[in-house]
Amino acid sequence: MLSFQYPDVYRDETSVQEYHGHKICDPYSWLEDPDSEQTKAFVEAQNKITVPFLEQCPIRGLYKERMTELYDYPKYSCHFKKGKRYFYFYNTGLQNQRVLYVQDSLEGEARVFLDPNTLSDDGTVALRGYAFSEDGEYFAYGLSASGSDWVTIKFMKVDGAKELPDVLERVKFTCMAWTHDGKGMFYNSYPQQDGKSDGTETSTNLHQKLCYHVLGTDQSEDILCAEFPDEPKWMGGAELSDDGRYVLLSIWEGCDPVNRLWYCDLQQEPNGITGILKWVKLIDNFEGEYDYVTNEGTVFTFKTNRNSPNYRLINIDFTDPDESKWKVLVPEHEKDVLEWVACVRSNFLVLCYLHDVKNILQLHDLTTGALLKTFPLDVGSVVGYSGRKKDSEIFYQFTSFLSPGVIYHCDLTKEELEPMVFREVTVKGIDAADYQTIQIFYPSKDGTKIPMFIVHKKGIKLDGSHPAFLYGYGGFNISITPNYSVSRLIFVRHMGGVLAVANIRGGGEYGETWHKGGILANKQNCFDDFQCAAEYLIKEGYTSPKRLTINGGSNGGLLVAACANQRPDLFGCVIAQVGVMDMLKFHKFTIGHAWTTDYGCSDTKQHFEWLLKYSPLHNVKLPEADDIQYPSMLLLTADHDDRVVPLHSLKFIATLQYIVGRSRKQSNPLLIHVDTKAGHGAGKPTAKVIEEVSDMFAFIARCLNIEWIQ
């Protein structure tokens, strides 16, 4: 007796592709066309089962009500100074998009400068990137619709917040860098393409160009400053040096933390910017990352991982740039990772380190590199910073699993450099004193110690009875640091849950070594690390397999899907958000080609063999043992996700329902929800965020029989 009547879905058994002598069947390749009537009918049929299932979850209403109540707290960014004014972002609580405010002084009256909520009825137009001119008098800002990566750039005169007529289109993954004369701005665009470009298409993004837009002119007159016709995957972002004299061009080939660095001395362009710039190729290989910090004349300070996987600061003199002449300003730390650096008050450097997944903030001397001060911080993450070379003050924002945020302000002109609390936010209804956060280090399959944070109510019995929510990512050198999540705290508070975040390999938690330990031929380490996290939680009595949910998004969606295939017995519930599921074809759609630096590419025989072993789409099989079924699975994606296109999740759910869902022993649901007017996640309006987490936690509660605790 089938527990679920899944839709009858056509299988094209003739759809076969050959890879290096292997014939791979791809019966749902027709779902790769997002515009076909068949695909639309498939999505509609899936949503028709999923939406009622989610709406009938007994706690969905309670969860959504509580989420709406607790998420309604003020959310601030750090203040930042532009020209003679201060700006900051602020959301009163439940506004769909945060609003940009301006003040003439820190004590002055705050006025709305840009409110994205006025740009759509449903909050689906979001601010994506912005840049002020050097004098703070002009403002460029990017808008994206429905969660797409495509951006339209518009301009304003800051005085009186006056709209200007300039509009830039065909923009994606862009820099925004004004020349210091305020005449114009560098940005990136893509060539015209056939068909639509609204975020629902899947066509590949190649041949990005660097252009210069002169304020007050039409985009058709913009000046092409750099292009790479022989290297279609290259992407080059520009920035201006602090003194405005040099344009620095960072060229990236994929997602690896390595870039070429070219520069142009604008004093060598006597007629201004009129065409391809006279680029000097300072670094012309992909052997390290070079992140500009500041310069004193021709001596440039960079943060680099060249021969230093945890990063260090070096000085390169542009007049004598040979690598043998580079000077170390701040050496690499043996264990801690240097995450970012900023120059402030002309001669100070602010350095942010990651020490066992917790941030450390320091002040150093620009001339000698010497440590001057370590700023006091609780255990958690620095999530905001402002302060540039010409500023004499800094703001920084701290958060943790149990603290929504404190913003500190430090006046660097004072003798005593004491940061003061500038703003502190509390959330009514969740008392941090009732909960505890611990960090443990558990052994993975190969013995490597992996850090994991665990958050739970104080005083719980470790008897294996608690529902647990385990989150992971594990890729692209991205570190998953403590963050404040109301939706997860509701799970802890009202569902009696344990929250766990595993800092598995592939991330940047311990520098480039940690990243390389979870990519390419080592990708299986990510899955092993995550499965060992689950086993640790079970062994220590936090939870049991039937009470354990795993969750991840994007590369983390791949993670949880691969783990469900490899160890269906270990988890009770899996929620995969916008996951990469077809590892043989991902590089063919939108920006997927950039991820080959982490995954490899099936066009190469050796890579194909790695990918085929774990690709979620190609490893779905009915468990052999009678008493093992797949966990309850909910896939989430959206029609305007042009980062990880929805076809990944569509093909995966069709495969799951066909191979597993038709079996008598599979009583757990295998469902997908496809949202509309939404994308990969950036800029998602609050209303949609609340609906999404209500769906997720209602699904968990229904599938794992979790009662709501008032």
UniProtKB/Swiss-Prot annotation:
Record bears the keyword Protease: yes
The keyword Cytoplasm is annotated on this UniProt entry: yes
GO molecular function: metallocarboxypeptidase activity; serine-type endopeptidase activity
Signal peptide stretch: none
Swiss-Prot/TrEMBL GO biological process terms: angiotensin maturation
Function as written in the Swiss-Prot or TrEMBL entry: Cleaves peptide bonds on the C-terminal side of prolyl residues within peptides that are up to approximately 30 amino acids long.
Taxonomic source organism: Mus musculus
Catalytic activity: Hydrolysis of Pro-|-Xaa >> Ala-|-Xaa in oligopeptides
Alphabetical list of SUPFAM superfamilies matching this protein: alpha/beta-Hydrolases (SSF53474), Peptidase/esterase 'gauge' domain (SSF50993)
Modified residue annotations for N-acetylmethionine: M1
Broad class of enzyme this protein falls into: hydrolase
Family assignment from sequence similarity: Belongs to the peptidase S9A family.
Sites of N6-acetyllysine modification: K157
Subcellular location per the Swiss-Prot or TrEMBL entry: Cytoplasm
Name under which the protein is recorded: Prolyl endopeptidase
Key words of the record: Acetylation, Cytoplasm, Hydrolase, Protease, Serine protease
One cellular component (GO) term of this entry: extracellular region
